[in-house]
């Protein structure tokens, strides 16, 4: 049992270890945004209908950061959208989103980028139907699904 009060945790985020002091109820999303200043994953402020805008990759799997406590993910490898840029180099999913006009307001974009990256890591030669099914846990209220699936399909067929 953890608490009451703050507890120390060590999180491995984007390849670096971070020692944090958090309340046991602190979600991974809150720890990332409030303590590590990694604001790419978004808080859609409605726990009853998560849009997936807070998607991160934990040990290779797309996960909503708002559904995990920071104390739960110690020892796991956490990857945020910020990890998909190294210097001037962008991950092909990010460049594919731009090339396929896969964003409008941009709120869902980081979550969709991470869900797409995780999905294509597991199924690099996916078909359109597999992509649509694989990204079904994320919601775009602007309706840019055509561009998002076009991006994933372009990568699956050989690159962005």
Ranges and model annotations:
Residues 1-160:
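Signature of N-terminal electron-transfer/Fe-S-associated modules in redox systems
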